[in-house]
């Protein structure tokens, strides 16, 4: 079995990396510190947003980020809320960037 980073460690490292780049990011929902899945919401500060989740690519055998949903921010927030109801261990990180 390949060793894996804990979700808590990965989230802290990701936030530190964003902070070094002067990109605002916040944990809006803490999940399971060991094995919780991580969802990243990108708020583009124009009323739009995208949500990304990590997935396993069976063809390459690697983990990739896929778009869960995108559109008006309230719709993205509703999709994230549905995901949280289905997965209480889910971490949610919100990133604010116009890019």
Residue ranges and their predicted role:
Residues 1-99:
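Polybasic/polar functional segments that serve as interface/processing modules
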């Amino acid at each position: 079995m390949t060793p894996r980073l804990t979700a808590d460690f990965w989230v802290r490292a990701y936030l530190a990396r964003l902070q070094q780049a002067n990109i605002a990011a916040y944990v809006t929902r803490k999940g399971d510190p060991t094995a919780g899945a991580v969802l990243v919401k990108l708020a583009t500060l124009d009323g739009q947003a995208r949500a990304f989740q990590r997935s396993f690519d069976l063809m390459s055998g690697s983990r990739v980020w896929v778009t869960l949903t995108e559109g008006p921010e309230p719709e993205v927030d509703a999709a994230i809320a549905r995901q949280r109801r289905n997965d209480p261990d889910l971490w949610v990180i919100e990133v604010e960037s116009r890019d």
